[in-house]
Amino acid sequence: MLEKEQIFVAKTFKEHFKGDDKSPLVLYGIGRNTEAILQCCSNLNIKGLMDQDSVGQFKIGKKVLSYEEIIELRPKIVIVARDSVVNIIYNRIAFLEEKGIKVYKIDGTKLCKDGLKYDNEELPYWSVSEKALEKAIDQHKVISFDIFDTLIMRRLIKHDRLSFEDEKKYLVKRDIMIEMLNYAMRQGKKIFLVSDMYYSSKELRELLEHCGIMEKYEIIVSCEHDVTKEDGGLFKILKLKVRKQLGQEAEESILHIGDNRIADGEMAESAGINTFLIMSSYELLMASSMQSILVKPGGLRWNQNVGYFISSFFNNPFALSGQNGYVKAGNLQELGYFFIAPLIYEYMLWLINQILQDDIEQMLFASRDGWLPYLIYEKMKQKNTNLPNAIYFKTSRRSVTVAAIRDRADINRLTKRKFSGSIKNFFQERFGILAKEDGIWENTETQTNKLLDQYERLILENAAIERASYLNYLRAKGINDKSKQGLFDFVAGGTVQYHLEKLIEQKVQGYYFATMNLPNDFYEEGCISAPFGNITSYGLDTKLSKHYLVMESILTDQDNTFVKIDTNNKLVFAEGENKKYQQMKKIHQGILRYVEDRLELDNVFTNEKNFEWDFSGPDGLFGYVFEEKNAISDQLKAEFENDDLYDGQQVYNSF
């Protein structure tokens, strides 16, 4: 027998596609509503189904078609899904429009890329709150709770059946819902836990206790009764137990709380039980302004990273109440924890994998943007003592290139790089000397040769002095000890690495987030390990590559740009004060807390050569910060600053 929703969906579909009895149709979806359409519209030319996880299988008597089969068939595609998730599915298959394939909603609305926008702002659920749930609990004598995705949840987006030990590993309680459970108990309500699950009540109790839920509530589970919530059988058992234990009056005052609108909603109501539906963390993500992250789901690491995010950010089913579905970080610590840390954390795991494969004996982290990765590395080293020792050292393009100058060829190479500013600033920033000339640095051949002829001797003399001091500093740090060394840099063209190699007369293996505009005078493309590849003006295909300057401003330490070591072995920095560091430190706190939390769960320190790294999930979380209605306010955006004194740029906002 069809439920109200199924009847409505089938009727709506039939009204708008009844004239398409000849045209091939494909339904995207394999759920109850699709089944209702197939049952009620057998006269239509429905050739098959679509579902990202079931390609090639037969569902509801129809084959789930591949993209190749769809392109050959050229049907109309109708998305059979709630309005709140239609955009996710459409974005997943929008490329098919290039093949002349049109995509529709069940009401006949043709979907198109230009017309898409986030349209869940008026979702009734955004007005639901824990206060409303408390009120509903107050009005009933008996409260039953669903277990999975209501009281406890897994830190995974999708999963097959897990082993019992893995189940424990990935489980986390939903704190607000445990508060609601305890609230009901304090109010003297009779409590039952009702679950469609393959675990016995004894096993479920063990999982609940693992999550800190120690009270011995009565559990009614499908595998012990051969009926389910889905078929209504468990609710009949619940009512029977309530009547026997508490009487008929209590039987008529049951509230069931759960997340599944069919099993916990419609089926409970059809049994005469009042309901209060909450959203699972996954449903919250699907309905929220972050839904686009689900358009291209990845593999295991995507699953784990995005799963951890939703189990944290959407742990509270009322997290978006009053926000119209828009996800926002309330402060800089939250910004660091939820949106920045996942990308850095995944990179650091990748880095460890690489240095273990490459048998690196000493890992170098260059200032300033090596500071936070260094702190994270040290935390990871506590977890894996086989990692090589790490050194954080002061360097910059200015300091290392000047110290590495030995002849006119070195000088000429450094003049090729673009500089915006005066002649005086050019010679100060590039070579560490004072020039007398006024005027703008034009970098013409005539101007360059004339000025270099004039200042070559002074440049070489200063370079020798700075080289001696800087080499003393590097020796004191233990950097030129002839170990097999790796070097972290964030996004770069290899300038620091190349000149450091010249100074210590030793090759160093570079590990970056991404390289920049390779090949260049220093390195060919591909010789530096970088999971985000080589960023060029035409290769901005990840969120990191588009917004790396913001990440760069986050990673840095408290000091201004390092200039040199003076003759008294003192570190010299660019003038001024790094006023924004205290704000960046708040982001650091959130990131480091995330790392500590993940290290409690993860065991992915591996030297496996073909480990399947997947940065798409963390990259998507990072990219959300830059959405139109984004995760942070304009006031917080103002805290992100960078400078590029080496190329003549003063402080600027990096957002």
For the regions a protein language model found, what residue spans apply to each?
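Short amphipathic alpha-helix with an adjacent loop that forms part of the alpha/beta core around
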Residues: 65-74, 130-136, 236-242
